[in-house]
Amino acid sequence: MLTMKDIVREGNPVLREVAKPVPVPLSDEDKQTAKRMLEFLINSQNPEIAEKYSLRPGVGLAAPQIGLSKQMIAVHTTDENEKEYSLVLFNPKIISESVEMTHLEGGEGCLSVDREVQGIVPRHARITVKAINENNEEVRLKLKGFPAIVFQHEIDHLNGIMFYDRIEGWVDPYKREINPSL
């Protein structure tokens, strides 16, 4: 079972890497890892389990957040109509996005970020994601609202992007300036 000790925190270089594609057909090891990621999210939303194991509630988790530079995400959330999204995806790509933008009123948070970050994170209101599911099948998901925001946040992790990188005027304290004169 994954716990908060397994979640890498900001400043860890793996969070800034572009994750590697997962070979298909999927290995049993990759399927198990993804299953454990989803299990973490489900457990984190259960008040008794979350309290017992000191889990912070989460709706999405990307493999880089557990130290693996692989294109794998898990999501466990619902939309405004209570439709549940509880799944793992491999090699997810956003293949279309709306011009219309949206954001979460209170800003975004992240299991890998132990502090509150103020600011609005602009996201596309609607997206289509293409990916491989745990049965090695290609799937396409049309998403809007909160699930669209969650999937964009997790797919950003696969590209080395933290949510606060998208806040206008944000300066990353962990980003190193490269001195061209050296």
From Swiss-Prot:
Active-site positions on this chain: 154
Pfam families: Pep_deformylase
Entry cofactors: Fe(2+)
Family: Belongs to the polypeptide deformylase family.
CDD domains: Pep_deformylase
Name of the protein: Peptide deformylase
Residues annotated to bind Fe cation: 110, 153, 157
Cofactor note: Binds 1 Fe(2+) ion.
Organism of derivation: Halalkalibacterium halodurans (strain ATCC BAA-125 / DSM 18197 / FERM 7344 / JCM 9153 / C-125)
BP GO annotations: co-translational protein modification; translation
Function as written in the Swiss-Prot or TrEMBL entry: Removes the formyl group from the N-terminal Met of newly synthesized proteins. Requires at least a dipeptide for an efficient rate of reaction. N-terminal L-methionine is a prerequisite for activity but the enzyme has broad specificity at other positions.
Keyword Lipid metabolism (UniProt): no
Molecular function as annotated in GO: metal ion binding; peptide deformylase activity
Highest taxon of source: Bacteria
EC number: 3.5.1.88
Protein's gene: def
Keywords: Hydrolase, Iron, Metal-binding, Protein biosynthesis
Catalytic activity: N-terminal N-formyl-L-methionyl-[peptide] + H2O = N-terminal L-methionyl-[peptide] + formate
